[in-house]
């Protein structure tokens, strides 16, 4: 078993991003990331704080707007439009989930696709599925960086993705197909799941079930990517994969924490920097 160290890879990428940001600043082009948080959800506050901290660390111009849970949908849409129109901001991120009275679909549609660093706008989803991506959801994008860093051969390999969300499962499957893997998407209703997972050269698990994947579910020598984040009764964090069991079967495996999580935030920063570079080239 070899560990895929997401924390170390994220730190390496952050150092490279800082160099790129410094070069953009020399050309009077400071990449800007605007983050909007609605309400007081504790987990969302932690995520936003981590994003803002990393943005500052690599030299981005970062703005965090905290809105009360009572903010109207129209007020939020108006704020997004202000960021859309401003050349100061190259990335816009609205932290999910949103209060029930605000339509998540309307909010995601309101963000300029070229500033949609989360990659959730339908136009960006469509571009990804057409094989011509602009912005890619950050967790799958981070996983692909892991594959590159650790020289994981994907072409012709059998990949199984457990989970079919728009945030991880579906875009992950498409990125694997673009890398010429043969991909199966499984989910909570899939029958005989073990028959699929035992055949997988690459297994990506993003289903939100604490340690559901055991050693007997995994092919010897498989690459296992664990996207899950589940807390047990003692508050300890676990993935969707039983790490202690599966590490003895897998050739490569991500831990939880310290695997996929650090890469997710780093890819948000990377897409913001790329958006700023793209805008600068357009203005030449």
UniProtKB/Swiss-Prot annotation:
Residue ranges annotated as coiled coil are: none
Q: Quick one: a GO cellular component term? A: cytosol
The catalytic activity, as recorded, is:
(6R)-5,10-methylene-5,6,7,8-tetrahydrofolate + NADP(+) = (6R)-5,10-methenyltetrahydrofolate + NADPH; (6R)-5,10-methenyltetrahydrofolate + H2O = (6R)-10-formyltetrahydrofolate + H(+)
Gene Ontology MF terms: methenyltetrahydrofolate cyclohydrolase activity; methylenetetrahydrofolate dehydrogenase (NADP+) activity
Annotated residues for binding of NADP(+):
163-165, 188
- Please give the Gene3D superfamilies that the UniProt record associates with this protein: Leucine Dehydrogenase, chain A, domain 1, NAD(P)-binding Rossmann-like Domain
Its UniProt pathway annotation is: One-carbon metabolism; tetrahydrofolate interconversion
A GO biological process this protein is involved in?
tetrahydrofolate interconversion
Enzyme Commission number(s) from the entry = 1.5.1.5, 3.5.4.9
Show the Pfam families listed in the entry: THF_DHG_CYH, THF_DHG_CYH_C
Record family assignment: Belongs to the tetrahydrofolate dehydrogenase/cyclohydrolase family.
Record's subunit section = Homodimer.
Listed name of the protein: Bifunctional protein FolD
Q: Which organism is it from?
A: Lactococcus lactis subsp. lactis (strain IL1403)
